[in-house]
């Protein structure tokens, strides 16, 4: 099986390397997200990311702000003109992001370790034209 990779292309974003996608690992408050986005936009960055759902090894830990954070990303897009992105781990995450108009999704390293989760996400994205980078961390 040969893997076909396509470059990520977004209108108004130069195809140069490296492509910088920046923002908080975890979106914790609207103020944090907006402040970070405005600072990055002022530096000329075009791609903003924020973790909305945070998978945890230990149950009971902070699992992210969830769907509420998607409204913050919509506001980032509206106020700065940046493209917005977040990590997805389930089909429900995909559907919520698509409803919110998120521009780019990514599949994190933890999720890639579960082929059932990857297939669920792929099924949710059928017929959708949205960039979906896949993280991969090789652990020794």
Language-model features: where?
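Hydrophobic faces of well-ordered beta-strands that scaffold small-molecule active sites
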Residues: 20-22, 48-50, 84-86, 105-107, ...
């Amino acid at each position: 099986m040969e893997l076909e990779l396509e470059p990520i292309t977004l209108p108004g974003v130069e195809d140069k390397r490296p492509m910088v996608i920046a923002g908080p690992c975890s979106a914790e408050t609207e103020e944090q997200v907006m402040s970070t986005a405005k600072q990055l936009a002022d530096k000329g960055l075009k791609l903003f990311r924020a973790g909305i759902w945070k998978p945890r090894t230990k149950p009971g830990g902070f699992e992210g702000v969830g769907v509420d954070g998607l409204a913050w990303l919509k506001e980032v897009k509206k106020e700065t003109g940046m493209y917005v992105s977040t990590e997805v781990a389930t089909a429900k995450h995909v559907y919520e992001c698509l409803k919110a108009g998120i521009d780019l999704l990514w599949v994190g390293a933890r999720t890639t370790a579960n082929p059932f989760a990857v297939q669920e996400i792929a099924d949710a994205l059928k017929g959708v034209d949205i960039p979906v980078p896949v993280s991969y961390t090789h652990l020794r």
